[in-house]
A protein has these predicted regions:
Chain B
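C-terminal transmembrane helix and the adjacent membrane-cytosol boundary/short C-terminal tail
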Residues: 2-11, 37, 85, 89, ...
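Cytoplasmic-entry segments and transmembrane alpha-helices of multi-pass inner-membrane transporters
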Residues: 8-13, 85-120, 178-179, 192, ...
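Short membrane-interfacial helix/loop motifs at transmembrane-helix boundaries
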Residues: 25-61, 123, 127, 227, ...
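Transmembrane alpha-helices
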Residues: 15-26, 76, 156, 161-175, ...
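N-terminal signal-anchor/first transmembrane alpha helix
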Residues: 1-31, 101
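Membrane-interfacial helix termini and adjacent extracytoplasmic/periplasmic loops
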Residues: 116-155, 189, 226-229
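Periplasmic/extracellular loop-to-transmembrane helix junction in inner-membrane transport proteins
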Residues: 39-76, 94, 242-245
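Glycine-rich helix-loop "coupling/hinge" segments at transmembrane-helix boundaries
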Residues: 43-48, 219-247, 282-285
Length: 268, 285, 380
């Protein structure tokens, strides 16, 4: 059993070890080792396009995750315990958004927005001098569509396990609805909200398929990696991959430690 | 009170509603409309009403066939590899190591799937595993650019998504049930079949559904590890929109893919219900 | 002193000028902050630094083909103008066209091939070039065969980058000799080279060379001829190593022995690994020329002109040719290239080897039947 687990971990980490190993190569080839050097790390960090792509990715992931978390949580709050047609329509929308393949979302968003922009721009441009085009906005919209639905599912799932007696008690004790939410409901659904935010951020940060279609002239990190790979993989790409992974490992372990500390603290 | 409550609900739902309308309803409606249109001379879309695009769908039969073979196969392979690991993590590992080992399952997920798949090109290419096998006398093994390579890439890419739901299901399992079974003299393998496996079914179904759905729309792994020879519906869509610029036919293929997915997932949930696996929308998470 | 060399933005310059005129700052201050002081001090000796004062922004986006530039030249461009070049690489003209057609590509310069230009002009996606902004382009020094497709109805839309051919690259240590016919290419794929042959991932050359195998025109859109080509391709498919336009890695590591190949890639591989050779199909095939062009909605047009002009400087162009191994149609550039390069049979094949080759036609690119044929081939 233990051996088996070891084998699976080896399977998971072998390619990553290879990426990390070749990132230290001194030569140009990304698939063989020619001496040891850190120069590719320096190059990646000094490459303005890498930094800009990273910044775009972080910006899009952060904004879309914030929006998705807030809007999704609001919807989940409203949907809990709700019945009727509106509820059914929303349930359907959530299910479709989660189930439809990313590639279909990407393509559909692309052709819909291009068509709408072509209709709107001839009116908009002379009036305001602005021109709508694909970019950060469409990325946030398309990523958020999927991640907001995840948040709805997570938060609603959590809401449904809440003890209604607590809320009744709070109401009976004269708390305003908002007071009840702030002091009773919110602390209890917070883990689900945070989990939703993290999932949303990760999804958007790592997404290539949807971004490939709707990014317009923007370049996110996965898009940069994709187009660099077509130019021939260099150890620079391996260095970027290794750094992103190391950073996420640090964040994960940090989060883990914080969680442990907060759990260790006795509850008031 | 009732009035303010429904008004609050409306307020809370409006942003999400607008988002769904603009980014889900509108795009899907456009795809549906375009799928009845015609291809303009230089590509793109020309308005019209024709069923020609749908009539042409059999031209992508092979893509649908490949997807519908490799997606279930990939799901099954992931399941078979993930289950023992999830079992090990949930049942055998001491709590001290558990979190650590769980984190290690997700970490690869944080490196771009693109870069990880490219690492497999090296591993499966002539200088990788085949060269290793040649040392043992297995000459001329070709792995890269085959359906097998795509399968490896798929399992590799989606394994964590399968491990987690199963782990969660097994974690919830009441260990006393197994102790009781052991006390009653049930052999471990029977206890597994009669207690552990049925109780972990919700996790198995969730994981399988998740991986299956993602595989149905996959195009990256086949195009990287399949050398352009393993063709999924996703690849057909990419070619139609990013090479031959046939938007109406591409839209029809997209509609076809969504329909096929709805049917297969629907059948799957019905079968799952028969297994008594509980709530389905929860199964999605 | 260091500060003086920093370029000053146009707006800040105007403000300083205004303040100087009003007399609120001294002449010395004005010349100092605007950099004109330095410029005047070194006038005559350093024209490149003057070029910095002409503000083209700090970026330019180039959409081009794989292995087609010397990265050092982009660094030189940055040093000279302050603008960084973002290079996006594409695999086919179809792909470029699709991206540009969807709008908002964000490109400033792109590199269409001869047969794609009429389509861009018809669709209104390409900018007529202002040749006064490309002084390094001297039409008189170019071989008209590789320059004429850039001009349509008297308007110049593209200036020539390189020309080349699509032939066969072979690893002679595995193939046991030169492969110089499409007959051997496609028949060998099903026989002695089983599992070792690569074809391009776009219809023009893959279908075109299958047509040539049967003795038809590379550009044929005749349904009966296309049917024969399809039959051949589908028969060959299970024996192929891959369908991909990114063939260098597989050829270099020995997994693939034979591939459809562009001139420069053939030269690059041959330079590093002499056992990899390059030959033209003796039945025919493609000859092409690529052009620098500017999309209609290019966001940084000044930078686009500056980049094109920079790359067409004969000295830069010669450095590029040395790096990528594609022939140049510019006599001034060729005068700077070493004789052995000009005599290289890969880069400048003998005229009789070129004579059976055909330029791709505009209709070949947009023909929907060829696109569908390619899709059937890939999904078979």
């Amino acid at each position: 059993m233990r051996l088996y687990a070891l084998a699976v971990y080896a399977f998971l980490y072998l390619p990553i070890a290879i990426i990390a190993l070749f990132s230290f190569s001194a030569g140009r080839s990304a698939s063989s080792m020619q001496g040891f050097s850190l120069s590719w790390y320096g190059r990646a960090l000094n490459n303005p396009f890498v930094m800009e792509a990273l910044w775009t990715s972080v910006k899009v992931a952060f904004l879309s995750a914030c929006l998705a978390t807030v809007v999704g949580t609001m919807a989940a709050l409203a949907l809990t315990g709700m019945k009727g047609r509106v509820r059914r329509v929303f349930d359907l929308a959530v299910q479709i958004a989660v189930m439809i393949p990313g590639i279909v979302i990407g393509i559909a968003t692309l052709i819909a927005l291009v068509t709408v922009f072509d209709l709107v721009n001839p009116w908009l441009e002379p009036l305001t001098g602005l021109k709508l085009s694909l970019g950060t906005g469409s990325l946030i919209g398309a990523h958020g569509l999927f991640t907001m639905s995840l948040v709805v599912l997570l938060v609603r799932g959590r809401m449904e396990t809440l003890d209604p007696a607590l809320i009744e008690a709070s109401n009976d004790l004269g708390a305003t609805p908002f007071g009840t939410f702030r002091q009773v409901t919110f602390p209890q659904i917070l883990p689900a909200i945070l989990a939703g935010f993290l999932l949303a951020f990760t999804f958007s940060f790592d997404d290539f398929i949807i971004a490939f279609f709707v990014a317009g002239a923007e370049t996110t990190l996965p898009i940069y990696v994709f187009s660099s790979i077509r130019r021939g993989v260099t150890p620079e790409i391996n260095a970027i991959g290794t750094m992103v992974m190391a950073a996420s490992l640090i964040v994960l372990i940090g989060a883990q430690l914080m969680l442990r500390r907060s759990q260790a603290r006795p509850r008031p | 009170m009732a009035m303010t409550r429904s008004r609050a609900r409306a307020l809370l739902l409006t942003p999400a509603g607008l988002w769904y309308a603009a980014m889900l309803l509108l795009p899907l409606a456009v795809v549906l409309i375009f799928s009845f249109g015609e291809r303009s001379q230089i590509g793109g879309y020309a308005p019209g009403f024709t069923l020609e695009q749908y009539a042409n769908l059999p031209a992508r039969f092979a893509a649908f066939r490949n997807t519908l073979t490799l997606a279930p196969l990939g799901t099954l392979a992931s399941l078979l590899i993930a289950y023992p690991l999830a079992y090990y993590l949930a049942v055998k590992v001491t709590p001290k190591w558990k979190t650590m080992l769980l984190v290690l399952v997700i970490v690869p997920f944080w490196t771009s799937i693109l870069i990880r798949s490219y690492a497999w090109i090296f591993l499966l290419g002539g200088k990788g595993i085949p060269a290793f096998l040649a040392m043992f006398g297995l000459e001329d093994v070709r792995l890269l650019n085959t359906p097998f390579a795509v399968l490896v890439g798929i399992v590799y890419g989606y394994l964590p998504l399968m491990v987690f739901p199963i782990y969660v299901a097994l974690e919830k399992l009441d260990k006393r049930l197994l102790e009781a079974a052991a006390d009653l003299g049930t052999p471990p393998w029977r206890a597994f079949l009669q207690i552990t496996l049925p109780l972990s079914m919700p996790g198995v179904l969730t994981g399988s559904m998740l991986v299956f759905i993602l595989l149905m729309g996959e195009f990256l792994i086949p195009s990287i590890l399949g050398g352009g020879k393993v063709f999924f519906v996703g690849n057909a869509l990419v070619d139609l929109f990013l090479q031959s610029r046939n938007w109406p036919f591409g839209s029809a293929v997209a509609v076809g893919l969504v329909l096929v997915m709805l049917v297969t997932v629907g059948l799957y949930t019905r079968a799952a219900k028969r297994f008594g696996a509980g709530r389905d929308d929860a199964a999605l998470m | 002193m260091k500060d003086d060399q920093q370029p000053i933005s146009r707006k800040a310059f105007m403000e300083e000028l205004e303040r100087y005129r009003k007399g609120s700052v001294t002449r010395r201050h004005f010349l100092g902050v605007t950099g004109l002081g330095t410029a005047m001090a070194v006038m005559g000796g350093s024209l490149p630094r003057m070029a910095r004062a002409q503000d083209i922004g700090n970026r330019v986006v180039l959409a081009t083909w794989p292995n087609y530039h010397d990265p050092a030249d982009f660094d030189a461009f940055t040093d000279k103008t302050g603008a960084y070049t973002q290079v996006n690489v594409f695999g086919s003209n179809e792909e470029m066209l699709a991206k540009i057609q969807a709008g908002g590509s964000g490109w400033d310069v792109f590199v269409p091939t001869n047969y794609a230009i009429p389509t861009y002009v018809d669709a209104g996606l390409i900018e007529p070039l202002d040749l006064s902004k490309i002084p390094n382009y001297d039409p008189a020094s170019y071989d008209p065969r590789f320059a004429e497709a850039g001009t349509i109805d008297g308007t110049v839309y593209g200036v020539p980058k390189n020309w080349g051919t699509t032939g066969i690259a072979f690893n002679s240590s595995k193939t046991g000799g030169v492969v110089d016919s499409w007959k051997t290419f496609f028949d060998g794929a099903r026989d002695q080279f089983d599992g070792r042959v690569m074809v391009h991932d776009y219809q023009l050359t893959t279908i075109g060379n299958a047509l040539v195998y049967h003795g038809f025109s590379f550009n044929s859109v005749d349904p009966a001829e296309l049917a024969k080509a399809e039959e051949l391709l589908i028969d060959v498919k299970p024996h192929l190593y891959a369908i991909s336009s990114d063939y260098q890695p597989s050829m270099r590591n020995g997994d693939a022995w034979l591939t459809m190949c562009w001139t420069g890639d053939g030269k690059q591989m041959n330079t590093d690994m002499p056992e990899i050779g390059f030959a033209l199909g003796k039945e025919g095939g493609e000859i092409w020329s690529d052009y620098y062009a500017i999309p209609k909605d290019a966001p940084h047009k000044d930078a686009a002109y500056a980049l094109i002009n920079f790359l067409l400087d004969p000295e830069v162009n010669a450095r590029e040719a040395l790096a990528h191994g594609y022939p140049v149609a510019d006599a001034r550039t060729n005068a700077l290239l070493p004789q052995e390069l000009l005599d290289d049979p890969i880069i400048y094949p003998a005229a009789e080897a070129l004579s059976p080759l055909e330029f791709g036609a505009a209709v070949t690119l947009t023909d929907p039947n060829r696109a569908e044929l390619m899709a059937r081939f890939k999904s078979a």
